[in-house]
Amino acid sequence: MTIQQTPEELAQEVKRLVSQLQAQGRNDLLLRAIGVPLLEELRIEAAKGKLSRLVITKDYRFILVDYNNKEVELQPVHKAVYLLFLAHPEGIEFKRLADYREELTRYYMATAKMLDKEKIIEGIDHLVNPLDNAIHEKCSRIKKVFLDMMDEYTASYYYISGHTQKRFAGSSRIWYERLKIITLPRDLVSRLELFEETGIVFGEETEV
């Protein structure tokens, strides 16, 4: 009769096997056994203890509630870009931003209520133009703001970063999507109420 091991016992067995592989210098086999997707899940799980919930208020203030309610100071255009990437955890290629023009415009109009509509449209034109450097500049600014607030490892979950994904078509065609994503687990993103202007909904309602 086989005695079923408890999760804790299985964890100890895994730890023992990992130690044996590392002692033999075979991290390559360890990585192959774990797999990259699981490795990323483990990385996120390990970081959760350091990550703060991000609360987006009804007037589009970005608050890190677990870091003493620190506010992420961003201009309306940066907030609009950030909201777009938050809404698409699957990632977006910069060269395809024009496909998200309408959605990005809604976010910008919601975050920049005092700005003239023509100025908003002009700003969107720059952002979705693949020959313009505007989106790179905005993402660099967002990255700097988070780096100024926390260490680089923690900040990497909050800012917009690159992720290359291998794609297959049939038996011979292979191509790569160069996606830009925010890796922050979406269960850490909350809102104080539904965003009626944009239709965007993140996580659960919470209080600051």
Residue ranges and their predicted role:
Residues 1-40:
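Long, compositionally biased intrinsically disordered regions
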Residues 115-133:
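Intrinsically disordered, low-complexity acidic Ser/Thr-rich regulatory segments
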Residues 196-208:
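Extended catalytic cores and adjacent scaffolds of nucleotide/polyanion-binding enzymes
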Residues 30-83, 88, 189, 195:
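Short boundary/linker motifs that mark transitions into or out of structured domains
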Residues 25-26, 35, 49-50, 112, ...:
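Short, flexible coil/linker elements and helix-boundary hinge sites characteristic
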Residues 40-51, 134, 139-197:
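DNA-binding patch around the recognition helix
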Residues 71, 75, 129-136:
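Short, solvent-exposed loop/helix junctions and linker helices
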Residues 70-121, 142:
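Short amphipathic alpha-helical recognition elements used for nucleic-acid or partner binding
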